[in-house]
């Protein structure tokens, strides 16, 4: 199954169509710009959403976690605080990795955490070596969702769990006008004032709108043989946690 984003020649970069081969560099530039101010995307509510992700995952000291697009270190540190086992943090963006590692080092939280610069669509991780795979706010930025999901399944051991936390599509119609106003008018202006880069935040908003809705992403997961799929909407569907297993 091809990615919901792409054709054979172009793919979506926000609302723009760009050559497939250029998207990774464009996304990298965005995250180089926003690495230290990514909290603006949710006004900090992402912390509650990540707590919900970890609640559902239930960390275990014998389970190895791979956190993809995890350069901020948030999921890794939360997993360790809750008694989880070793963590591999993988991110395509070196600036995000450095920001995350620096943040965790200040609090002495680097024990048993490995940092790897790598691509979600071609992970530098052996087959069947991971107990749990998480990706928080990263799947919508890949060029091919299908390739990223296939890679997730490849690295999971049988019985391993896939979990994705991502901005999604509001399920409550009453919140949509306010959500649209914040997304398209307020957030890009905050980005301009704080980071001097309005376009980076504009892309992030557009990437959310181009991302498959909850049911569509569930179909993508099933298409690569991830099984027992389910999801939970957070904040009325502004964000969603998806869960699946390699059986």
What kind of region is each of these model predictions?
Residues 44-63:
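Conserved alpha-helix/loop element of class I SAM-dependent methyltransferases that forms part
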Residues 1-28:
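N-terminal auxiliary segments of SAM/dcSAM-dependent transferases
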Residues 121-133:
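A short acidic, Gly/Pro-enriched loop at the edge of an enzyme's catalytic core
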Residues 18, 22, 165, 169-220, ...:
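C-terminal alpha-helical "lid/dimerization" subdomain adjacent to the S-adenosyl-L-methionine
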Residues 131-145:
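A short SAM/SAH-binding and catalytic strip from SAM-dependent methyltransferases
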Residues 64-122:
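Class I SAM-dependent methyltransferase SAM/SAH-binding core
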Residues 218, 224-247:
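Core SAM-dependent methyltransferase catalytic element
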Residues 146-158:
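A short glycine-rich, Lys/Arg-flanked "PGG" loop and its adjoining helix->strand segment in the class I
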């Amino acid at each position: 199954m091809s990615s919901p984003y792409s054709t054979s020649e172009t793919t979506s970069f926000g609302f723009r169509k760009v050559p497939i081969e250029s998207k990774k560099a464009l996304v990298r530039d965005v995250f180089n710009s926003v690495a230290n101010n990514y909290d603006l995307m949710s006004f900090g509510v992402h912390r509650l959403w990540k707590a919900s992700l970890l609640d559902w995952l239930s960390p275990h000291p014998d389970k190895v976690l791979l956190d993809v697009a995890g350069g901020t270190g948030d999921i890794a540190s939360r997993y360790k605080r809750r008694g989880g086992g070793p963590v591999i943090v993988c991110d395509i963006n070196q600036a995000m990795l450095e920001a995350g590692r620096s943040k965790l080092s200040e609090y002495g939280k680097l024990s048993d955490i490995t940092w790897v610069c790598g691509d979600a669509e071609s992970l530098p991780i052996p087959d069947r070596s991971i107990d749990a795979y998480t990706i928080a706010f990263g799947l919508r930025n890949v060029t091919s969702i299908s390739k990223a999901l296939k890679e997730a399944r490849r690295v999971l051991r049988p019985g391993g769990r896939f979990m994705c936390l991502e901005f999604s599509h509001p399920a409550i119609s009453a919140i949509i006008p306010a959500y649209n106003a914040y997304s398209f008018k307020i957030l890009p202006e905050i980005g301009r004032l704080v980071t001097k880069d309005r376009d980076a935040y504009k892309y992030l908003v557009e990437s959310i709108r181009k991302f498959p809705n909850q049911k569509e992403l569930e179909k993508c997961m099933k298409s690569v043989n991830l099984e027992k799929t389910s999801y939970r909407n957070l904040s009325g569907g502004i964000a969603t946690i998806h869960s699946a297993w390699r059986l």
